[in-house]
Amino acid sequence: MGQRPQLRLVKALLLLGLNPVSTSLQDQQCESLSLASNVSGLQCNASVDLIGTCWPRSPAGQLVVRPCPAFFYGVRYNTTNNGYRECLANGSWAARVNYSECQEILNEEKKSKVHYHIAVIINYLGHCISLVALLVAFVLFLRLRSIRCLRNIIHWNLISAFILRNATWFVVQLTVSPEVHQSNVAWCRLVTAAYNYFHVTNFFWMFGEGCYLHTAIVLTYSTDRLRKWMFVCIGWGVPFPIIVAWAIGKLYYDNEKCWFGKRPGVYTDYIYQGPMILVLLINFIFLFNIVRILMTKLRASTTSETIQYRKAVKATLVLLPLLGITYMLFFVNPGEDEVSRVVFIYFNSFLESFQGFFVSVFYCFLNSEVRSAIRKRWRRWQDKHSIRARVARAMSIPTSPTRVSFHSIKQSTAV
């Protein structure tokens, strides 16, 4: 139990030694609890140790397990852990009881706070890195007009949706204090609605990615007939009435705490969570069909368009499970085990905060069209500056006497 619990143990021993009546009563209660147990042969009799734990009648040679005491010298302990004591082969209890697993609840709360603060740091770090990467990707798609086809416009809008979601995440973290959270003012509810709207747009733009690839590869429908406004309606338009319906539900049935969380028995959050799960499942079906076609019909094809489709599919195959895993984690109960809870907190914090970074990497930084356009821009910039440098050097060379005399001779001849 550590140094301080050991000091408390010494004090408890002194107190118990001075009060034999209470010890005798505990022994009687422990003996009465052991009457129901059927133990034959050599055995250890029921006994209460100096901490107050009842060790029931047990066969010789057995290691007996008992829950940690709920209270010990005014301190609460975690009763889900156990203490251990051996019933020796001669039918007597071992003098030493192993309480090493028993931990103060105060210490557990401190550990939980430490893990919480680390998770907060991971969240801030991940969202900062993601936001920087997303902004760089956004500027690249904005500046590189030569690659502005419908496929890359969809990538660009997906990145924009993630930028807005990350930005509203920072707004929520920096403005919604516990006091504001409890007061449930109108502006904090609007901030929550905006964050949830951009959260939904992430999934619908991923759905747009899946629709485009499924149309081009599985349905073999010409992508020239697809229009940007169709995907704008899917990505930005459809989530809006969903969030409006959710906000109305919150206003009438769960209007508290800035619309974060939910009360037991109130399911208004499923108004926007349901469509997110639906488009996620549809995208998984799309990807299954796309991969099936790529593995059969397009394997031998080496056209540049097919290569781009394959790379887009690879990116979507990585990102869609990434988005899906992080969202499905909200429905998972990590359990009571401390290790599983800590792993769950860290894993969820990492995936949730670094999503934007992964989207930027797979759809922009690893995009061969983007990289090729950047290389061309870089070469043009180098050529332009090298020409300027050569001209500047030529202009800075002083005119030699030979050239001056020759020029004057030509002028005199012309006259």
Curated annotation (Swiss-Prot):
Glycans are attached at residues 38, 45, 78, 90, 98. GO terms for biological process: adenylate cyclase-activating G protein-coupled receptor signaling pathway; adrenal gland development; behavioral response to ethanol; cell surface receptor signaling pathway; cellular response to corticotropin-releasing hormone stimulus; corticotropin secretion; exploration behavior; fear response. The chain crosses the membrane at residues 112-142, 150-174, 190-218, 226-253, 270-295, 307-331, 339-368. C-terminal Ser or Thr residues may be phosphorylated. Phosphorylation at Ser-301 by PKA prevents maximal coupling to Gq-protein, and thereby negatively regulates downstream signaling. Residues 1-23 form the signal peptide. Residues 24-111, 175-189, 254-269, 332-338 are extracellular. Gene3D superfamilies: GPCR, family 2, extracellular hormone receptor domain, Rhodopsin 7-helix transmembrane proteins. It is found in: Cell membrane; Endosome. One of its GO terms (molecular function) is corticotrophin-releasing factor receptor activity. Its main location: membrane. InterPro entries: GPCR_2 (IPR050332), GPCR_2-like_7TM (IPR017981), GPCR_2_CRF1_rcpt (IPR003052), GPCR_2_CRF_rcpt (IPR003051), GPCR_2_extracell_dom_sf (IPR036445), GPCR_2_extracellular_dom (IPR001879), GPCR_2_secretin-like (IPR000832), GPCR_2_secretin-like_CS (IPR017983). Disulfide bonds join 30-54, 44-87, 68-102, 188-258. Residues 280-290 are annotated as: Important for antagonist binding. Heterodimer; heterodimerizes with GPER1. Interacts (via N-terminal extracellular domain) with CRH and UCN. Interacts with DLG1; this inhibits endocytosis of CRHR1 after agonist binding. The transmembrane domain is composed of seven transmembrane helices that are arranged in V-shape. Transmembrane helix 7 assumes a sharply kinked structure. This is Corticotropin-releasing factor receptor 1. It comes from Mus musculus.
